[in-house]
């Protein structure tokens, strides 16, 4: 997407169907009409108003840049008959909506990564061996595969934990699966980039030998600002080249947004409480 505004974008954490909290935060921010709005994935699921949330973001048109999160992909997988609804899911209202086909098509055409103004947005994270160029190349491969006529077969093959680490020698299906898992699922990895998918607590809960993906030594995206969500137990975290946005709104905590000024010291945080957007425990 090319810039159509000189205003810095505002990036929102995982909405997960918390429509009222999003509307409250949007009103608090009161962005100018040409301010780009970024969404770090997981627009839907577990919150009480997934359909209204999705329709609202779709209605923003090209102003909205939303990357795919694991819950958005779960919506696609259920719509495609690859997965079934799970306890706590709130995407059934989307699937039953009269405009369901249009909404599913919109989600299916979202990117896995977005790079603009020296900032790279993904849902979950990146592997240490990837620089920004390789991450965008892999995101493009995934995006093109999900936009193709055989997207259902492709999506079915993306689910799975193996292989759990990157190699430039990976063949097509394995290459896409590793990228899929890094972009949408990763929290912890080894210093060498082997992913772990069970632990979902904060950084202190890292299994032995693992660390948060963004603390992997020699991470090749350390020179760009990475914007991401996904990790509610991590919470809002700002470093010079890191913006973590998921502060657990759907769990009754807070919804966060950050105005992404080019100067890290000028970035502005806005939050609202989410007491009325509590999801059932997993």
UniProtKB/Swiss-Prot annotation:
SUPFAM superfamilies in UniProt: Metallo-dependent phosphatases
Gene3D superfamilies: 3.60.21.10
Tree of life domain: Bacteria
E.C. code: 3.6.1.41
Enzyme class: hydrolase
Catalytic activity, as annotated: P(1),P(4)-bis(5'-adenosyl) tetraphosphate + H2O = 2 ADP + 2 H(+)
CDD domains to which the protein is assigned, alphabetical: MPP_ApaH (cd07422)
GO molecular function: bis(5'-nucleosyl)-tetraphosphatase (symmetrical) activity
Keywords: Hydrolase
Function of the protein: Hydrolyzes diadenosine 5',5'''-P1,P4-tetraphosphate to yield ADP.
Family to which the UniProt record says this protein belongs: Belongs to the Ap4A hydrolase family.
HAMAP family: ApaH
Protein name (Swiss-Prot/TrEMBL): Bis(5'-nucleosyl)-tetraphosphatase, symmetrical
Designated gene of the protein: apaH
